Amino acid sequence: MTSRNLRAFSQWSLAAAVLLFNALAASAQDLSNQSIASTTAPVMFQFVVTPDIGSIGSLSADSENNIWATALTNSVALHFNGSTWTKSAMAKASRVNKVAVISPTNVWAVGQGTNDKFSQIQRFNGSAWRVVPSPHFTNGESLNSLKAVAPNNIFAVGVSLDGLKNRLPLVEHFDGSKWNVVVVPNITGGELTDIAAISPSDIWAVGATGGATPAALTLHFNGQQWSRVSAPSASLLAVTALATNNVWAAGVQLGRGPVIEHWNGTAWKVVTSPTIDASAVLNSIRAISPNDIWAAGCNACGDVGGSNPALIEHWDGTAWSINPSPVQLGGLAANALLTFPLTKRIYVGGFAFSSFGASSFLMEGVE
């Protein structure tokens, strides 16, 4: 099972469909993206001992002493208080896709409710996780990610189904009192998988449109309305934003493997990155600075018989290169990244998969 399949193995997973087609596609084509040597020393990641929660699908923090990691399934999370990782029971859910930490008493998570047809939003108030009322569509919807611009300005993105069961991009907004559906371009087959913000009037959401050849879906919010911006063909699974003219997205191209795209303030363009197996995927991307950006995913996604390390790539301001990853029995799929610019500490979370099942893993490295 691939990392995104485990994240969203239900009817909602556009990304899972992409990976299925990808795994069946021909071997990787020559993209003229040969492996690139890094000009900086690699970060030596080490496994962090934590309770096993089956998988880590998301990481977020407001400081290095208040870190949350949520499981994709099992309705459980991990919390780090600066010295110890402990389990935290969440509200019952079929899936939790993303977590966002605002403060020790204000943490949000989005995913799917217990019946998997409808999305679920829950909040941690410092003592317990509780479900928060949110909009629902007759035919259902899914929320894949969220971004807290401020406590009273939170966006969640995903996909809904219309009366004809067509997939449509979905954005919801929390104004400090309640969640509401936001008007976005009506793009049939569209799904949003991640969101990043530079300011309240400069926000990006990325994803893909369905079909035999998925196309990139990038939406921009200027503080007033959402509009579609064209981007090279790909299924974009993650986005990180540094400045108005410096936004990065990562994902997968059908039959070709991982893709990284960059917004320079004018246009989205594919940036050369190392050649990987066609079944490899980048699930997460996070920036420390313009010359220090990290992306993570899986190498031979779904190969439960191998011992493939997690896929970790680094941008040093000039080129993308592969950073070594620890190896353990079974394959490793990274779903989540967390970076701390001041200390240059990086966390990578995901799951180890083998014929015996899946277990969560967390790695830590310091530049």
Label each PLM-derived region with a short phrase:
Residues 2-14:
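Bacterial N-terminal signal peptides that target proteins for export
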Residues 23-24, 30:
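Short, low-complexity N-terminal tether/leader segments at secretion or assembly junctions of large
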Residues 1-2, 29:
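Initiator methionine at the very start of the polypeptide chain
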Residues 29-367:
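Residue-level hotspots at or immediately adjacent to binding/recognition sites across diverse folds
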Residues 12-23:
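Bacterial N-terminal signal peptides
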